[in-house]
Every structure is written in C-alpha cells, then in structure tokens.
From Swiss-Prot:
Residues 99-298 are annotated as: Superoxide dismutase-like. Transmembrane segments: none annotated. One of its GO terms (biological process) is protein maturation. Disulfide bonds join C169-C291. This is Probable copper chaperone for superoxide dismutase. Gene3D superfamilies: 3.30.70.100, Superoxide dismutase, copper/zinc binding domain (2.60.40.200). It is found in: Cytoplasm. It comes from Dictyostelium discoideum.
Length: 316
C-alpha cells in the first residue's frame, strides 16, 4: 500500500432529489476524475459516498461544478483488520474497517472561528488550504490536501508539538517527535555516547551531533511540494512517523524553504509577528507560512449535521 494507490471513501452532503441527480454526478466523476467512483447514495438523506484516490478537494470541486452544493461530512479508510473469535469451535473471522479521521485548516479564511474543527487557522495573507488526515492502517496515516496562495518554491508540511494559535504560528513548539521515535533516538544517542568517550574527539562529536540533529529535523517533514506559478501545493502522503491518535490537538505548519512572506495575520488583523526565525528547526525547515490545529473529524456515517457549527452555513 502506498500513497498513490491507497483508496479512501469520502462521504458528502449533496443537494440531490432524484436518481437523475445521482446519474449526473456519476457522469461528471467519470469525465473529470479517473480514479474516483460513486459507490453509495441515499437520496432522502441527500448523501453520497465516493471511493478512489483523487484529492478530496478535487472531488468536492467536481461535484460543485454540476451546480450543486456539496460538503464533505465523513472520511474512512477501505483497509480492514481481521480478528478471530476464540469462542467458536470453528475459526470465525471478523473484518472491521480501520477508522479515524482528522482535519487541519491552514491559513486564514474570512468569517471562520479560529481553531474550530478544521476551520480557521492563521497564516500569511492569501494563503489557505485544508489538510485531511486519515488513519489508513494501525501503523500509517494519510495526509492529503491542497494549499493555495503560495509563492513559487519548495514548501513542506510538518507536525508541530502544540496547538496554540494565540500568537500565530510562533507558539507551536518544535517539530513533534512521537514516543516511539523518541525512545529510538534515545537508544541511538546512548549507543553513540558509549562509542565516543575520547576527549580528543570532542569537535568531531559535536559535528556529528549537529548533523544528526539536522537529519532528525528533516525526517519530521511529512511531504514537500515544489510550488509553481499557480501558487498551489498538493500533498498525498502515507506516513508511518506517528500514532494517529497522538496527532489530535497538535498542529501542522507549512514551512517555506525559499520565499519570504509578509507577516502572518490572525483573524483580527492585530498580530504583529515579523515571521522571525523562532527556533533552531526553522533555520533548517524555513519560514512558517501558515498553520492550523489538527482536529478530530467524522468518519463515514458519524456526521449527521446539516448546519456547520463554525460559521453557521447550511451544509446543503
């Protein structure tokens, strides 16, 4: 299983009223998206479920191009786990879908409440996007989405320790290291220290520590996109760096390795940050262009809301 071939299911609220509505959506999907198909629909509930490998943003825009209002209300993996029941004399196997979904809005969007379930983040003026997270298996997490309004150059997504947006992107801490990774790093450091006790090698040891620290920080990058003139960065990355449930409440930061941006703005336009380098990791990863809180989101069948609690808009 890799990031390009991993199929996911996407549930949407769509204003459909008859079978011809469903048929027109299916036709649009076949013509515009090669890797996504409609697999379920419920006309009375005005809900559809799609399955494929296209970006969720492309799916949403394709359906809206049919002239219908649409919102994503659930995301699920197609991966299943198998368990065996010991109570039966015969081997009874039960398959369960791996579940877990989250969303992170990076950048500024007008009239959205900061920190509200995947809604208002903070960022440089004009930069905005949504990254969706999906627990693809017991050990891997899918990060996918698009961020727009960027300057040409390399941009990287990185999970940071904290989810505090009060001071823009400045108080989000360092790149997050999971407990498993932290234990592994400690073991490696202990081994290195045991093998380097000669005082004459202090300079070499310091150089090695700096190199290892740099590699450690770069290893925290989820994915890197080389932004062109259209100003778009797209990501679809399957990562085994984190336990999915340990990501909720932390943050995702978009770092720019090439371009300088204007100061980050918050929703009240009163943030005086100068986008200064505020950590050692920023010297390696680059400027913090936009950020947002990772918020738990609904899996398929879990979200029955018709009105968004963040901005009060009607879903359909």
């Amino acid at each position: 299983m890799d990031d390009k071939n991993l199929e996911i299911k996407v549930e949407l609220n769509v204003d459909i009223s008859c079978q011809s509505c469903v048929d027109s959506i299916s036709k649009e999907l076949r013509e515009k998206l090669e890797n996504t198909k409609l697999v379920e629909h419920d006309i009375p509930e005005q809900r559809i479920v799609l399955q494929g490998t296209d970006l969720t943003q492309d799916i949403l825009e394709t359906i809206k191009n049919t002239g219908r209002n649409a919102t994503i209300c659930g995301l699920s993996s197609t991966t299943t786990t198998t368990s065996t029941s010991p109570s039966s004399s015969t081997c009874h196997k039960k398959q369960e879908t791996v579940s877990g979904s989250a969303v992170c809005s990076l950048g500024l969007i007008e009239n959205w409440q900061k920190g509200c379930g995947g809604s208002g983040g903070v960022g440089s003026k004009g930069v905005y996007g949504v990254i969706r997270l999906l627990r693809a298996s017991t050990t891997k997490t899918l990060f996918e989405g698009r961020i727009t309004g960027l300057k040409p150059g390399k941009h990287s997504l990185v999970v940071h320790e904290f989810g505090n947006l009060m001071n823009g992107c400045d108080d989000l801490g360092e790149p997050f290291i999971s407990n498993v990774e932290n234990n592994n790093n400690n073991n490696n450091n202990n081994n290195n220290n045991n093998n380097n006790n000669n005082n004459n090698n202090n300079n070499n040891n310091n150089n090695n520590k700096n190199i290892n620290k740099c590699k450690e920080i770069l290893n925290k990058i989820i994915g890197t996109s080389d932004v062109k003139q259209d100003g778009k960065a797209e990501f679809r990355v399957l990562s085994d760096k984190y336990d999915f449930w340990d990501l909720i409440g932390r943050s995702i930061v978009l770092h720019s390795q090439d371009s300088k941006y204007s100061p980050i703005e918050d929703l009240n336009n009163n943030n005086n940050n100068k986008n200064i380098v505020n950590s050692e990791s920023d010297k390696i990863l680059g400027e913090r262009v936009a950020c947002g809180i990772i918020s738990r989101a609904a899996s398929i069948g879990q979200n029955h809301k018709k009105v968004c609690p963040c901005d009060g808009t009607t879903a359909i």
